[in-house]
């Protein structure tokens, strides 16, 4: 029950944060984009947010986690039907400075998964573990080997000459 309430509260904070971002971009005069890069697509929240608020020719969304990417893949037809005038491309890669295999720490609460090192002794980590684990015997995260690519190589390979907006969740 604590996990459920915690996630609901986090979703409320996300909603208001997203609304602030959209208001800021509209205030700055942004109404349309040719190309948006969405690094850290998660389950498509940013795809929906940007395509609901802007005219976008193409959005390239990257999600590193194979587990979360499967969820995103299940939603892609919905997004493509909802936003027919936009091209939506999803990729199952991490973005980094070097092309290499890296270890992803896949957390139970998937929006916090990371390729960075986790400090399991930090107060933040301990609080997160307390609030988000239903059963203290459950895993909190597991490591999965994934592919990291260089963004510049991806842009060249896919003939993308300009990027109007880059959204990064790290």
Regions found by a protein language model. Name each.
Residues 1-170:
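Phosphate/nucleotide-binding beta-alpha loop and adjacent structural elements of enzyme active sites
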